[in-house]
Curated annotation (Swiss-Prot):
Pfam family of the protein (one): Exo5
Coiled coil start-end: 269-307
Region Disordered, annotated ranges: 290-310
Protein name: Uncharacterized protein ORF95
Gene Ontology BP term (one): interstrand cross-link repair
One example GO MF annotation: single-stranded DNA 5'-3' DNA exonuclease activity
Keywords, in A-Z order: Coiled coil
Length: 310
């Protein structure tokens, strides 16, 4: 890979402790060069956190804007997006910002997983959540002993819920998964909206069931996987200064596989489907011909038997 230091490696260097339970403050120099203490509003903290998340989400994707009219259209778009992201995880070994909606222990859950790393040799998935704080870190506390117990438990719970959600996506029965992704679409065997087909550059005959079959094929890679979890604790001040001064690169090489891969996969699956249908027809005709031949032989034997009795 062409990057100087991966996001995971970079943020592992910053793992530390959330130690301040009071008002978040930031030190900055005023116009005269004097250091002053400023209180940050919740909006400022959130805006900077969003910026850091966007920096960490540096895998380039070819996003396609698609207008939709109905809930069924939205379900199709989400299904197509999930297929593309799972393929990127499979091929590139990592994916960012995976939207996920699953059923865990009878409860419907939604979330966006910040980063997932796939090690195909070990069949291991690392689920990562980015936590950005505007507070200096103590870098010699890898076990996070200084973090309040409630924070540690909350973060741990969140990550383990993400693991449960991801595992459900990979292991749920096809019927349960179908119900989650396209259950409310009235006719799953009718072609999807032509505008969606045009945007994705796929045949206008593609159906919701065709897309769902591709999802099943793509998720079949992730069977019997082991899970690990990681929280990326990022000090906002330190991260921004490192990023802006170029001390550490956090930019991955480009990955633009979504639309091109999706188009090829759909065409391949349709061709495979047609081939299987053709083979099924051939086998069906052969079986019918065999039955006709057997019936003909039985009739001939019955005639011979009747003549012998006379």
């Amino acid at each position: 890979m062409s990057h100087e230091k991966s996001v995971t490696e970079f943020t592992r260097d910053l793992v530390g402790v959330y130690i301040n339970a009071g008002v978040v403050k930031s030190y900055a120099k005023d116009t005269k060069g004097n250091t002053r203490l400023y209180e940050l509003s919740n909006k400022e903290i959130m805006d900077i956190g969003i910026e850091i998340h966007s920096i960490c989400e540096t895998d380039e994707k070819e996003y396609i804007d698609i207008d939709y009219c109905t809930e069924a259209d939205l379900k199709i778009i989400r299904l197509a997006n999930t297929i593309s992201l799972l393929n990127q995880l499979h091929v590139a070994g990592r994916v960012c910002e995976l939207p996920i909606k699953t059923l865990v222990h009878g409860t419907s859950l939604r979330g966006i997983i910040d980063r997932i790393i796939w090690n195909k040799d070990k069949k291991e998935i690392e689920v990562i959540d980015i936590k950005s704080h505007y507070i200096p870190f103590i870098l010699d506390d890898p076990e996070l002993k200084g973090m309040p117990q409630s924070k540690r438990l909350g973060y741990s719970f969140q990550l383990h819920v993400y693991v449960e959600m991801l595992d459900w996506l990979f292991t749920a029965s096809p019927d349960a998964l179908r119900d989650s992704f396209i259950g409310s679409i009235y006719n799953k065997d009718e072609p999807i909206h032509p505008i969606i087909c045009s945007k994705l550059e796929i045949p206008k005959t593609i159906t919701a069931n065709n897309l769902f079959d591709i999802l099943l094929k793509e998720r079949s890679v992730f069977t019997d996987v082991k899970y690990t979890v990681l929280i990326m604790h990022i000090d906002q001040n330190y991260f921004k200064s490192e990023y802006k001064t170029g001390k550490a690169s956090v930019v991955y090489e480009s990955i633009k596989c979504n639309r091109e891969w999706f188009k090829k996969m759909v065409f391949f699956d349709l061709a495979e489907l047609e081939r299987k249908k053709s083979l099924a027809e051939i086998h069906k005709k052969a079986a019918m011909a065999k039955k006709r031949e057997e019936k003909k032989k039985i009739k001939q034997e019955l005639k011979k038997s009747a003549k012998g009795k006379k």
